[in-house]
Every structure is written in structure tokens, then in C-alpha cells.
Amino acid sequence: MEKKLGLSALTALVLSSMLGAGVFSLPQNMAAVASPAALLIGWGITGAGILLLAFAMLILTRIRPELDGGIFTYAREGFGELIGFCSAWGYWLCAVIANVSYLVIVFSALSFFTDTPELRLFGDGNTWQSIVGASALLWIVHFLILRGVQTAASINLVATLAKLLPLGLFVVLAMMMFKLDTFKLDFTGLALGVPVWEQVKNTMLITLWVFIGVEGAVVVSARARNKRDVGKATLLAVLSALGVYLLVTLLSLGVVARPELAEIRNPSMAGLMVEMMGPWGEIIIAAGLIVSVCGAYLSWTIMAAEVPFLAATHKAFPRIFARQNAQAAPSASLWLTNICVQICLVLIWLTGSDYNTLLTIASEMILVPYFLVGAFLLKIATRPLHKAVGVGACIYGLWLLYASGPMHLLLSVVLYAPGLLVFLYARKTHTHDNVLNRQEMVLIGMLLIASVPATWMLVG
């Protein structure tokens, strides 16, 4: 395995995977569920939680540098084979669904250039024309990554720099157009008819979604030139992304009043740019979104392919997925990931699902892997500061599970259940020194049984 990724490439990988499609729709998404007061509290909670999670990853890369398989290996080392697999399965599903959402939003953005009231070509990214285009992009990126992760990471660095230009222009114009009276209008969201704390809870999956990818450097840490760069890259990217998100959401509420902002079509940043600089604003943001999402898609494809590969090398996924090609790219894992993405694209066309549906599912699947990072640090930490970070990361993880609501937890059970069958099959393809204990066998049985009523309740 080649170790060629330096600090700049690792930082770009993390930042690009976070700054994807979400930031361009963030103004409307937040305005629809939260007042300025709730938004400030929500970002405070999320900022603190994500920084604790980033610090937990930084500490773990320092005290357990040999665990270079990312969040999957933390869960496995701390809580056994089954929990480790569940972390890998949940993270991989999140990555697959995130990739589908990026392909959908790219062609939704292209509709700004092609669609008219008389002609709906790309629509919301779920027309047959969009699916054909998304499939072509999917396989172009697939063969690019087969040429080697370093090649893809270099292209991603350029894409990350390019996406910051339209975001920077938006922030500068929004600062110039910001009106404090507009920002303070209905500051606590009385018009929403929901208490402030409930509004805060409603922002949690949205704010988590735009930070998914924070673990990017940890996932590819086995390919890092210097292991100490992994933690630095994570912190640099988190602080940069948090600054961008705060500016974009808070300034937007000072340009357009919250009720009006909540009605703007996504990507809502395009509508705001039209308010600030005329028709050209929409084109600039749509073009920026396309570059941004393509960069994020490239990052997520690298990370998505890495997970089954690493899990297979640790005997959690079937042995075939541990294969690499001559360029040291995880070829079998990449084929698995992109075939699943292709199937999901066809399902999107058949069901008419959109970006927001995919956002919710992807956010839900990442909750357990993130919680297990904090739990592992809490388990092995010896210093008081490290224990405090572990406690904080665990509390944030539990809060997210609570905030996501019971229906989303049911969805998690349904999506984890088929993974257990993969886990049991994988154990047959490897020679294992350790046998599953009674608690793990009971947990497998409970999850499989619980998936039946959970499926019925979701369908019903």
C-alpha cells in the first residue's frame, strides 16, 4: 500500500468531503425548521460536538497509531468483531447513499442551465436523462480511481480550491447586503409554532450532514505519508468548514427574512445570489455547486471504496474485497461500491426520491460509527483530558441518536439487518482465531428479529 498523501492532500480530502452539496442548500434547509436563535444554539452544539469528535480522532491517531483502518478499526478493537463490522457497514452505507445524493444534486444543478417551464430535462436530478448522465459520471470517476488514489487526491485538491471561490464571493456580498433588522425579525421563530428547543433538535441531522466526512483523513490514514498529519488535517478542515457554515447561514438570514428564505428553491444560495447581484448570481452558484459536488463525490468514492477493503483485510468483509490492482487501488471494493451506487440511481428514478430523502438516510447511518469513536477513546484513555474528550464525544453521539427520532432509528435497524448476513458469510471466507461470544450471537438474533416489525412499521 503506497503512503503518498501529505498534509495538504489529506486536508483537502476532508474539507472537500464536508463542503459538498449541503452548503449550497443550507440557507433554505435551516430557515425551514429554525429561527435565528435556534440556529445559533444548534451551530453551537454541533460545532462543539464535531470538534470533540475531531479531537477524539486526533488523540486516537496519537495513542493508537497502529490502528490505521479508521473508525471501523476503533470499533472493532474496542468492542469486538460484530460491533466493528456494524461500524464499517453503517459507514459504508452512508458513503454509498452520500455518493448517490451527490450525483442527484449535480444534475439538479444542471437544470438551472437547461430546464425551462416548457422543458423539464434534468428536473430535481431524478429524471431518466439525469440518471443516464449520473451513471456516466459514476463510471468515469470509477476508472479514474482505479488509476490510483494519489491521482484522484491530486485532482481533488484542485477541485477544493475551485469550490472556495463562489463561496467566498457569496460571503463577501452577503456581508455587504446584511441588515441587522432583517436578521432579528421573529428572532425566536414564533411563526414556526414550535418551541426553540424543538427547533434546535430539528436542525441536528442537517448540521450533522454537512460535517459528514470529518473522518476522511482517518479512513485513508494507512495511505498517509506522516501519521501525525492525519489529526492536523482533520482539525484544520473542521475549523475551516465550521467558519464557512456559520457565515453562510447567519448572513443569509440578514439578507432575506426567514419565512421568505424557507420558500426559496434549492440550491437556495443561487436564489440569494440573484437577490444580491442579479441573474448572473444563479449561474455562478450553480457552476460552483457542480464543481463542489464533483470534488466531494471524488472524496467520498475514495473513502467508500476504502471501507470494504480495510474491513476485508481485518476479516470483517468477504475476503474478495481485500484485492488491490497494480496501482494499489482497492479494485474489488470499488466495483462493489459503484455497482451499489448504480442500483440506487435506478431506484431513485423509479421512486422519484430527491436529495433531501437521501440526506436523512445517510445522516442516520453515520450515527453509530461516530458514537463508537468517542466510546473507544473513553474506554482506553488514561489521561483526564482524553477521558473528558471521550465523554463529550459520547454525549454528542447520544444526543444525535435522540434528536434523530424513533422512525429514523427504525430505519437504521432495517438497513443494518442485511449487513449481518454479509458478516456471517464473511466469517466463512476467512480463517478466524476468535469465535463469536454468546452476547454477539444474541445481538445478531435480536437485530434480525427486530428488523421484521421495523420494516412493517416503516412500510405501514
Curated annotation (Swiss-Prot):
Gene3D superfamilies tied to this protein: Amino acid/polyamine transporter I
Residue intervals passing through the bilayer: 5-25, 39-59, 93-113, 126-146, 158-178, 202-222, 236-256, 283-303, 332-352, 358-378, 385-405, 406-426, 440-460
PANTHER family in the record: AMINO ACID TRANSPORTER-RELATED, ARGININE_ORNITHINE ANTIPORTER-RELATED
Encoding gene (name): ydgI
Cytoplasmic side: 1-4, 60-92, 147-157, 223-235, 304-331, 379-384, 427-439
Alphabetic keyword roster: Amino-acid transport, Antiport, Cell inner membrane, Cell membrane, Membrane, Transmembrane, Transmembrane helix, Transport
Gene Ontology MF annotations: antiporter activity
Annotated InterPro entries: AA/rel_permease1, Amino_acid_antiprt, APC_superfamily
Protein name, entry field: Putative arginine/ornithine antiporter
Role summary: Catalyzes electroneutral exchange between arginine and ornithine to allow high-efficiency energy conversion in the arginine deiminase pathway.
Organism in which the protein naturally occurs: Escherichia coli (strain K12)
Record-stated family: Belongs to the amino acid-polyamine-organocation (APC) superfamily. Basic amino acid/polyamine antiporter (APA) (TC 2.A.3.2) family.
Ranges of the Periplasmic topological domain: 26-38, 114-125, 179-201, 257-282, 353-357
Domain of life: Bacteria
GO CC entries: plasma membrane
Catalytic reaction equation(s): L-ornithine(in) + L-arginine(out) = L-ornithine(out) + L-arginine(in)
